[in-house]
């Protein structure tokens, strides 16, 4: 039987932002805020007590920030998903949070519709995962929103596993990235990342953003088409 409700724990140190987010989240059908916390230490206790499905996590907080909190969640192997909502827009923080398993990253200030989209996407993801004991590649692609164009016949030297990794990673980003940044985030060679990005650009999955900055060669940056 399909689940009808998902519990959310909101970890945010600004009381006003916390209240606004709480009020909005409760307007999304099937989602309830089970508890709120003002810092990471309090949040960790509530995760164990309330056992939420999802944590909405800020980064800049006293006592224990969002980075340390997410790392602790993974270290303790707590079964909870995390969406980051933060003003932290530096690539180091964003990459670190995604590498530690954040399923989405929303930058403050944000439009409420962006939060709604994140929650609806999360609900769909959980429903599809929980409905099956085993999954086919096609079902996984649908869950991860991998465009079908990216998993057809690939040129020699490219494989579906890495293609899915690259595409899934790009889908989580809000800004364009260079081949070097993609390579670093996924732990692959820059030239390898460039080959996959070039293929995705040629097939219309992503678009190329050539940036000119000061002296030197222009930098090719890539972003998933909306």
From Swiss-Prot:
In-chain residues carrying the UniProt-annotated modification 4-aspartylphosphate: 58
Entry-linked PANTHER family: TRANSCRIPTIONAL REGULATORY PROTEIN DCUR-RELATED (PTHR45526:SF1), TRANSCRIPTIONAL REGULATORY PROTEIN DPIA (PTHR45526)
Gene behind the chain: dctR
Listed GO CC annotations: cytoplasm
DNA bind region: 179-198
Entry keyword set: Activator, Cytoplasm, DNA-binding, Phosphoprotein, Transcription, Transcription regulation, Two-component regulatory system
Residue stretches spanning the membrane: none
Name the record gives this protein: Probable C4-dicarboxylate response regulator DctR
Biological role: Member of the two-component regulatory system DctS/DctR. Essential for expression of dctP.
Native species: Bacillus subtilis (strain 168)
